[in-house]
């Protein structure tokens, strides 16, 4: 079932800290300011967890292998992550959000949705609230934040990218559908490279192209996601802002443009997936014991393999090694692999972990 109309009464803000981890490092170490900085490990198997804007100018980004990052930017400075510090700053930012609303949905340490429709300060204009929040974040933490304001989460998220860094933008109910129609589908939040490529093969390049398709057509080609694309192409997203809920698992997966047939290629794909899962778990202070590998073959058959450890996984290398050990017995592959996924679950409470388990080595 789809929605007939987008509610225009809600006021949603998406706040996104600018190059958060790297900016914290530049804030705390003046020698790093104005220089290309990558948070992560510089070792051969290291992965970039975050990059400063100076580094991004060279094509350095999160989840990029450190060797590749250094090749793109020879002057790149690697800094080991300090997740305890990032979490402490995130708490400060969350307290600023709470001055205005209790409807806070964190997506990670550095971004969150806020529903300020009925806010604590009684401020009727959401753009004013966003301006106040960004100024308070700068005052309290010394860091810059960008914000997007709209009537739904999807458009607030898209708006927060429009004037980065250190800016904000609004997409009104009047302009929402037109904004989506003009937007390239490959820029839609939630549409990955493989889905964008599929849409383009079907002649869907923009939101307007997507809107021209019927619900039945979209469901035929995109399954359960068809209804989502149908609504989003019309600027409709009625998802509520939901405060934090306990996570049962954290996973990452990737669909490949060309099916994978050999083990080395599959191993290379596991590395960034494990890094993405680890980065999110470290940011949330989650410590898990069960690693699950998901494999989707070219004929869409899906298999999973899991392994549970006696103690919580303490390092990124251990997570990746566990995933790789689950992968290797599947080769030689009986058919091409279309998708790989890595998930960490069986989380334990923070108080059960030791201090050294909060340190990340990449």
What kind of feature is each model-predicted range?
Residues 5-7, 14, 187, 195-339, ...:
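DNA-contacting surface of Y-family translesion DNA polymerases
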Residues 1-221, 226-227, 344, 348-352, ...:
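Gly/Gly-Pro- and Ser/Thr-rich, intrinsically disordered tail segments characteristic of DNA damage-repair
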